[in-house]
Amino acid sequence: MLYDAIVIGSGISGGMAAKALVDARLHVAMVDPARDSRLRDRIPDKPFRELRRTDADQRSYLIGDHLEGIPAAGVKVGAQLTPPRQHISRGADDLLPSQSETFFPLLPVSLGGLGAGWGAACFTFDASELQRMGLGGADLAPYYQRAADLAGISADPGSEANGRLWQGVGRHQPPLRIDTNAESILTRHLGDPSRLNQRGMTLGRIPMAILSEDFDQTRRANPYFDTDFYGSVRQSIYRPAYLIETLPADRFTLLGGRLALRFEDKGDEVLVHSRHVETGVFETHRARRLVLCAGALNSARLALHSLGLVGVKTPILCNPYTYMPTVNLAMLGREARDDCHSMAQLGGVLRHDDSDGVYGCYQMYSYRSLLLFKLIKEMPLPPALGLLVARTLQTSLAIFGIFFEDQQTDSKHLEVLPVAEGQMPVVRFDYRQTDSEIGRQRRHEDRFASGLRSLRCFPIGKVDPGKAGSIHYAGTIPFENPFDKRFHANPDCTLAGTRNVYLGDGAPWNFLPAKGLSFTLMANALRVAERVVAAS
């Protein structure tokens, strides 16, 4: 069959691109391993504390039947993934092989991609950020609104954080309730905003792709059960799979269980060569247009391999990320309400120390349903004492994670290695920050920690989960490639050297702002899909 378009990838970008193409009456196929786990659907629709008291099957989703929810040692990328979410990357080492000594990304093989476990925070990029990314001429405002309409966003129009994080989206749901811990922090900040403002920081409720009101008959308002890291929670958190499942069968085909290996642009059609992950059978699918939404790292793998550019280096962008567990003194000895959601409660930005731009973007989580053992294993204390301390501090623990901007340098790149016909090429990653970048990040971390202390949230550590730990990847097929001019994105988001291959994810970006990229990935995918429709 000759499809109008094939979308490779089912994640944050792929879901939105497929939706826009199908809505335009195109016949669309999606190629993706699309592995899924229904463990999340076995979790009773009850509050976390009640499940801990009464559910005899809680082991299966809290720590896993094979203890897979207990990391063996250290902090690794994806450590926050609970057993019901670990299918996201299960088997990726075989399906998406890589080599590195410096960069160990989370590579998804699941239905929904990384969107099957994302944090749901949604931010808009401003004109200066879009300019640096290579999207200076793009008006994303209507696409941001369309993405919000499709995903379901809850936002507080009066939040101080909006000035840098949320502009131009008029329609959204009311804000979510925040938990007791966050309320105490926000109350202290609002009593004297100058404490943070003089340090170049803002703080407030942030937009979240979590429903505060029912969306339709399937996706319902978040019940504040504090089980969001485990179950589907009435589908209240947007996942790409929920959107994909609504696409009409007469115009959309999910070619699940397939691993795209390479493509060929023949001028009047594109051939997508894939392998069935279970049977090993090779297949070729045909379409007039191809939209790469495999995620920046895998889109680059496919494109380099398909163009025969073995050994050619291309940039990597990835937000550096640090999180700081803190003790909120206002909550010591206080009880916290049980009714809360598990995701980020508050957030804000940290301005550049030498300009007015945003250098860091942070979110605050309470430490409740992720279980104390994950905290105890990071404490420099004997386990019994660590447990006692953790129980004492539990309601007062506030985890602040901060992301920093990233830009191209000579020491951040990937390349594909030679491979036999019909095999997935190995990607070699190398990601090393320059001394200047490291120094700047440390200065901003110190100022950030000072701001937290002014809120009476005292850091008890600083954790670096690794150079791929933010799980924010972009910039691998940039508009401007400093490594090799042959491998880049054209201004219309087609892949250089092809006529019918479009880049629908974050691979073309020249720069990665500190703000979470997922909401802009959604909007950009809708924009690129519109171009595909216009060319069809």
Map each language-model feature to its residues.
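N-terminal glycine-rich phosphate/pyrophosphate-binding loop and immediately adjacent elements
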Residues: 2-132, 136-137, 310-329, 334-340
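Core beta-strand elements of the Rossmann-like FAD/NAD(P) dinucleotide-binding domain
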Residues: 2-3, 280-289, 293
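Mid-to-C-terminal "cap/lid" subdomains and adjacent gly/pro-rich loops that border
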Residues: 35, 47-84, 289-296, 300-400, ...
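Conserved redox-cofactor binding core of oxidoreductases
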Residues: 55, 62-84, 98-100, 104, ...
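A glycine-rich dinucleotide-binding beta-alpha-beta segment and adjacent secondary-structure elements
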Residues: 90-92, 221-232, 256, 261-265, ...
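Conserved beta-strand-loop-beta-strand element in the redox core of flavoprotein oxidoreductases
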Residues: 262-284
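C-terminal catalytic lobe of FAD-dependent flavoproteins
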Residues: 376-458
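A conserved FAD-binding loop/helix module that cradles the flavin
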Residues: 511-529
